């Protein structure tokens, strides 16, 4: 795609998000991301953004996909996370296996709602799922599944082959967990007793972890969108909120702080979207963007004062989502270990 095409894509995604996502952002937070909204995302090609066209997807390149994620996250990080799960976790695992490729068409059209059991591979956890294969049954429990309302899931079985399983039914929620952020997506524990499953490959945990590591630039894009959405609200609020007969923007601590954050946003974006990245550069983009999102959303919340904690102002969700997203999609210590291995050409930073 040419530069002009990327600009046109950004403009069209932003227009769609503002019209169809931002207008129901509070509803998404309160009631979750509806099937209707998912179909709306699919109608624009977002649910299959990285799925090849031969399997019903849009087949966007890396930069175009990042633009989609960033612009959706400006309005609803939950919507961006739903697209991320479909395109950067679920679909790559299916494509790599070469099996059940037909399901990708249903993912792209939002006929199928998907999830991947990846939370056990996050920092502070060390486990496979509790799913075992007994004959023609897959049985057990999956704890802390993001998008737990999915009808099709991928899990790594707790067996000698650590099989990667595609499970299309025979499971249900046994517990819905409270969540700090990404409230548009269900966060649940599932009980599985299914005969409707397929072994995609062996070494499932390793493959899921590799997919997580491959999301460096995508995670950076979502984090940038979260930061940009929060800062936009803070800048606009500082223009209209008066104190001592002056708008907040007239005061140096507010104006200087927001200006520096806006400038830093552009620096992080320029780096994340550069044409060529080394492996180390991708990790840096992820770490910097995630850290920036947490800092920027915190400052945006402070600019709003007490009003920032009211849901109707729409800024507190960005702070919550920045924190939740960093926990669910960024593994700081492991990311830094990967970076150190790239720099030192050997295992480093493990003591």
Question: Residue ranges of each PLM-predicted region?
Answer:
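Amphipathic, small/basic residue-rich leader segments at the start of a protein or domain
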Residues: 1-84, 342-351
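Glycine-rich phosphate/cofactor-binding loops in nucleotide/flavin-utilizing enzymes
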Residues: 2, 68, 89, 304-351
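Glycine-rich beta->alpha junctions and the first turn(s) of the following alpha-helix
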Residues: 2-9, 173-266, 325
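N-terminal glycine-rich flavin-associated loop
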Residues: 21, 80-100
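C-terminal helix-coil-helix/basic helical segment that borders enzyme active sites and/or dimer interfaces
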Residues: 21-32, 239, 243-246, 262-291, ...
């Amino acid at each position: 795609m040419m530069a002009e095409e990327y600009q046109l894509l950004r403009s069209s995604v932003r227009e769609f998000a503002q019209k169809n996502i931002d207008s129901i952002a509070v509803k998404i937070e309160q009631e979750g991301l509806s099937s209707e909204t998912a179909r709306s995302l699919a109608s624009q090609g977002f649910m299959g953004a990285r799925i090849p066209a031969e399997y019903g997807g849009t087949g966007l390149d890396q930069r175009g996909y990042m633009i989609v994620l960033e612009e959706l996250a400006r309005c609803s990080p939950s919507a961006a996370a739903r697209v991320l799960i479909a395109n950067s976790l679920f679909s790559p695992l299916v494509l790599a296996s070469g099996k059940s490729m037909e399901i990708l068409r249903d993912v792209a059209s939002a006929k199928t709602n998907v999830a991947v059991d990846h939370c056990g591979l996050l920092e502070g956890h060390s486990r496979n799922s509790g799913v075992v294969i007994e004959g023609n049954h897959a049985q057990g429990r999956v704890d802390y599944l993001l998008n737990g309302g999915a009808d099709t899931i991928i899990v790594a079985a707790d067996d000698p082959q650590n099989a990667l399983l595609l499970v299309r039914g025979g499971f249900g929620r046994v517990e819905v967990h409270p969540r700090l952020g990404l409230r548009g997506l269900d966060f649940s524990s599932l009980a599985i007793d299914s005969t409707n499953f397929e072994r995609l490959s062996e070494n499932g945990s390793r493959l899921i972890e590799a997919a997580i590591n491959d999301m460096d630039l995508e995670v950076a894009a979502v984090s940038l969108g979260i930061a940009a959405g929060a800062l936009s609200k803070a800048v606009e609020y500082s223009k209209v909120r008066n104190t001592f007969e002056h708008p907040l923007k007239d005061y140096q601590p507010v104006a200087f702080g927001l200006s520096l954050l806006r400038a830093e946003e552009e620096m992080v974006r320029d780096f994340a979207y550069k044409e060529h990245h080394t492996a180390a550069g991708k990790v840096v983009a992820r770490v910097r963007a995630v850290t920036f999102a947490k800092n920027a959303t915190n400052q945006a919340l402070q600019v709003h004062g007490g009003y920032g904690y009211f849901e109707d102002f729409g800024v507190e969700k960005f702070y919550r989502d920045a924190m939740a997203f960093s926990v669910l999609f960024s593994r700081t210590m492991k990311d830094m270990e990967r970076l150190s291995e790239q720099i030192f050409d050997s295992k480093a930073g493990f003591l």
